């Protein structure tokens, strides 16, 4: 995947989280969303992207309230500001 495709993938993830806000989403839901956007990822590749975006403070990964072992992702205020600045909302 080249740099432009990675940017589009990251935008797809962030926009999906923005649409769900303030609710967090599990990785499996994000996988379905990026597949609908035309990206084919496995669990590991998605986790790498989520970790990257979390490192940039654009999203946060938290454990599920019902099961601590199941992570969920949520858009941060910084992530929303980024999407607004890029006219993606």
Regions found by a protein language model. Give the residues of each.
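Short alpha-helical segments that sit at the start of domains
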Residues: 1-24, 89
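Short acidic, hydrophobic short linear motifs in intrinsically disordered regions
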Residues: 23-34
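DNA-binding alpha-helical recognition surfaces that contact promoter or target DNA
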Residues: 32, 48, 81
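Short amphipathic alpha-helical interaction segments
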Residues: 40-55
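A short, conserved structural fragment
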Residues: 54-64
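Minor-groove-contacting beta-hairpin "wing" of winged helix-turn-helix DNA-binding domains
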Residues: 66-75
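Short, amphipathic alpha-helical interaction segments positioned at domain boundaries
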Residues: 74-89
């Amino acid at each position: 995947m080249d740099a432009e495709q990675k940017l589009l993938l990251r935008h797809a993830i962030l926009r999906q989280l923005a649409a769900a806000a303030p609710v967090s989403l599990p990785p499996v839901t994000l996988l379905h969303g990026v597949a609908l956007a035309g990206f084919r990822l496995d669990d590991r590749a998605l986790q790498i992207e989520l970790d990257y975006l979390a490192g940039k403070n654009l999203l946060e990964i938290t454990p599920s309230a019902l099961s601590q072992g199941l992570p969920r992702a949520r858009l941060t205020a910084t992530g929303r500001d980024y999407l607004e600045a890029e006219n993606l909302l």
